[in-house]
Amino acid sequence: MVTHPDFFGGTWSTSPDPVDFRAFTGPDLTVDLPNNFYHDAAGKPYPLVRMGGKELMSLEQYARQERVLGYYGGQMASFEAVFSPKGQDGQPMPLFDRDTGRIDPFVEKAWQKYNISNVLRTNWKTLGPKLRGKLHLFCGTADTFHLDEPLRLLETEMKKLGSDAKIEFLEGRTHFDLYNGGLTERIAKEMYAVARPKVRGAR
């Protein structure tokens, strides 16, 4: 949507993966100093998985679990497949060392072009008019993977820019029950109204 605003009629994104890299499921990927993917400067582990108000798994535990299961198919590897430059071996370069959590500053810098919040902020003069009425995002306030946190940062940026983006937080909903209560039907109706505006009942 952000890359091709003239082509798409809108986006209705639910529980979007980190849209602001200042909170990439924990670490801030926008800082210049050497950073760690597993813990903050004080050594406190970044939590990742929560359910019922309880933190169940840290980011380090999650990454190590994926490593045991295999390189391909995991969430962290999928981020690298999309965002990372290609290494000498032809594979996506890892953002962080799986043993220590140390972030590779070269890869971190390469990821910045996918930081949606920053892309919007720095290109708003051009993108703003093209995205008017097109941005709709939904997330639970208790998202299982803390995805509400980067979305709140994006919401703040959108307000500063005067955007009409509709960012909605569903109280108490997690990553897995977000659609309860008719959200699917609501999104479908809104999409249909854009795609088929002349059809009766579309709005």
Model-based region annotation:
Residues 1-203:
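Non-catalytic cap/lid and distal C-terminal segments of serine-dependent acyl enzymes
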